[in-house]
């Protein structure tokens, strides 16, 4: 199983004064994305410490949660026969990685083998062999605790969020979305710097965050995705969680969608689930420029009450460090 090259991470201590960063270098012979979050909730008067190993979490993406993205990506036609209750409802949840417990076997090959390969990196994307076009997909990823009742998920409890690249192959003819998402180690990205979620509501921290994304090519910074507020996802907060629980439990194997519940139960009902909740629309540059060898893809989640988009782009152009309230993912493309 492939592993990420991550060997360091950051702590965030959440207090009445805001987020206070503490850095930790992990000494581990088998480098994992091991993210320690410390969140102090003043109203509860205790400190919550979480050790998180992404390679043991099931990971997913949400298709069609920003109006217009699927059309730009040339994927809207794939969902022609997928019925939704609302016009702006996302189309499907798709898997990007399903961990198998050490003692478990992939009984009856329920989980496609390629989905059991760990695809995440904090620093690079390796170009898929034989493919001509791959595209950055800038997203907000959320880490959840999953509460199970037998083989069904009853609750998804949001823990933290961070910048994510749901990098995708652009080609026609793939039977399932997941076939364009995981082509092996170093095919996806999650920032090593996650931020604790205080409340997954319009009153919580996420409501002031925005998603910006860029391509750095030959030293020049280009805006890649439209600068977008997380609150402007078509489905967000309770509505999104209710929808995701329903899809994780009941989504059928039809069209580009897959039976997610069968994968999760075959994997032993993972306690941690990471979901990238949808890619933003592209700028004109992003629509027409695919990732090439040596390009650097950048996804940044930042609080709009502290920074403007112009300030974020300027800091990137000047190669300045970002503050602890910003989640950043840099990935260099390697052929």
Describe the residue ranges of each PLM region.
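Cysteine-centered motifs
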Residues: 6-9
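Glycine-enriched loop-and-adjacent helix/strand subsegments that border the catalytic/binding cleft
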Residues: 55-266, 311-335
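A conserved acidic, glycine/proline-rich C-terminal tail/linker
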Residues: 262-291
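Conserved "cap/hinge" positions at secondary-structure junctions
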Residues: 277-279, 298-303
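Loop/turn positions that initiate beta-strands
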Residues: 293-295
């Amino acid at each position: 199983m492939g592993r990420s090259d991550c060997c360091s991470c950051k702590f965030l201590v959440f207090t009445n004064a805001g987020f206070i960063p503490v850095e930790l270098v992990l000494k581990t012979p088998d480098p994992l994305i091991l993210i320690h979050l410390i969140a102090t909730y003043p109203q509860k008067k205790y400190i919550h410490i979480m050790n998180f190993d992404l390679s043991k979490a099931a990971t997913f993406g949400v298709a069609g949660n920003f109006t217009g993205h699927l059309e730009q990506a040339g994927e809207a036609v794939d969902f022609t026969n997928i019925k939704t209750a609302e016009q702006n409802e996302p189309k499907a949840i798709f898997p990007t990685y399903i961990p198998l417990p050490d003692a478990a076997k992939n009984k009856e090959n329920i989980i496609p083998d390629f989905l059991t390969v760990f695809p995440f990196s904090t620093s690079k994307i390796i170009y898929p062999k034989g493919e001509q076009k791959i595209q950055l997909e800038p997203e907000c990823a959320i880490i959840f605790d999953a509460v199970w009742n037998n083989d069904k998920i009853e609750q998804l409890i949001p823990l933290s969020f961070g910048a994510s690249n749901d990098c995708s192959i652009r080609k026609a003819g793939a039977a399932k979305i997941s076939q364009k998402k995981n082509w092996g180690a170093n095919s996806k990205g999650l920032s090593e710097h996650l931020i604790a979620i205080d409340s997954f509501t319009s009153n919580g921290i996420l409501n002031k965050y925005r998603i910006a994304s860029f391509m750095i090519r030959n030293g020049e910074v280009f805006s890649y995705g439209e600068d977008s507020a997380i609150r402007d996802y078509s489905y967000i907060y309770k509505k999104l969680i209710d929808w995701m629980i329903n899809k994780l439990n009941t989504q059928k194997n039809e069209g580009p969608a897959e039976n997610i519940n069968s994968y999760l139960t075959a994997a032993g009902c993972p306690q941690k689930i990471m979901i990238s909740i949808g890619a933003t629309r592209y700028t004109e540059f992003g629509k027409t420029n695919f990732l090439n060898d040596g390009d650097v893809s950048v996804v940044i989640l930042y609080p709009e009450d502290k920074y403007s988009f112009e300030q974020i782009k300027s800091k990137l152009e000047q190669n300045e460090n970002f503050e602890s309230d910003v989640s950043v993912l840099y990935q260099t493309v390697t052929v």
